[in-house]
Amino acid sequence: MQAEREISNGTLWAGRIIGGLPALFLLVDGAAKLVKPKPVVEATVGLGYPESVIIPIGVVLIICTILYLIPKTSVLGAILLTGYLGGAVATHVRTGESLFSIVFPVIFGVLLWLGLYLRDTRLRALFG
């Protein structure tokens, strides 16, 4: 196994910001699912999901995002969030949403992984 190379402060902070902004958005989205305001309920039901799954989806999203934000579990969190975002893409494709609605979760996934790559020596060692 290669020796871990040190990450510069600039790269570390760039990774924290690039990954942190979408993570913050996902935490807010998860919290909104727990509170269930009318627009969230309408949007979820409009995508073909019953209202009864909104809170469980919010809990899963918050847990996955917290795992992403904790350095020791960040890779697991990124993998789980990739699955979550893949489900979002599939939902938008299935319901015939706009291209933006389909690409938006993909962009989030790329930003999450890029942020993790910039701040995690294990991931950097894996990809050289």
Per-range role (PLM):
Residues M1-V28, I70-G128:
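Extended, low-polarity transmembrane helix blocks
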Residues L24, V28, Y49-L69, G83:
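Core segments of alpha-helical transmembrane spans in multipass integral membrane proteins
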Residues D29-K33:
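A short secondary-structure junction motif
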Residues L34, L47-G48, G87-A90:
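Generic helix-packing signal
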Residues L34-G46, L61-K72:
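Short juxtamembrane and helix-loop transition motifs at transmembrane-helix boundaries
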Residues K36, V40-E42, Y49, V93-F100:
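Membrane interfacial helix motifs at helix-loop boundaries and amphipathic/re-entrant anchors
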